[in-house]
Amino acid sequence: MDGQPITGGVHPTENLNAEHHDFIKAALNETGTHAGRKYKVLRSSQQVVAGMKYTFYIVFEDDESGQEYKITAWSRPWLQDKGEALKLTFDKHEPK
């Protein structure tokens, strides 16, 4: 994927960078209860949607249950309103 344009559907994110981890940490900080916890990214994807939508599936390193969580980050950096420029969600993920 690196260097090639991304179009249309959902594509795996092959190499997580600092910006991706910043999105994850920001989502964890918004929860209040998970701020600062160490996590492991199980898989991630990205999609062009009037900006970029990133989806990360994580587990917490200190959680023996293996519960997965889904974080989404919708980045539209050209918007002036910071609340609209980055939308974050954090949810429990129940694999099907």
From Swiss-Prot:
Q: Where is the Cystatin domain?
A: 22-65
- Asked if the record carries the keyword Glycoprotein, the reply is yes
Task: Keywords in alphabetical order, please.
Answer: Glycoprotein, Protease inhibitor, Thiol protease inhibitor
Q: Would I find Transcription regulation among this entry's keywords?
A: no
- Induction of expression: Up-regulated following apoptosis induction by staurosporine. (Microbial infection) Induced in salivary glands following dengue virus type 2 infection.
Describe the outcome of a gene knockout: (Microbial infection) RNAi-mediated knockdown results in increased titers of dengue virus type 2 in salivary glands but not in carcasses.
The organs and tissues expressing this protein are described as: Salivary gland. Midgut.
Pfam families in alphabetical order: Cystatin
| Glycan-bearing residues | N29
Please name the GO terms that the record assigns under molecular function: cysteine-type endopeptidase inhibitor activity
Additional free-text comment from the UniProt record? Negative correlation between cystatin transcription and titers of dengue virus type 2 is observed in infected mosquitoes.
Q: Which family does it belong to?
A: Belongs to the cystatin family.
Q: What is this protein called?
A: Cystatin
User: What's the source species' lineage?
Assistant: Eukaryota, Metazoa, Ecdysozoa, Arthropoda, Hexapoda
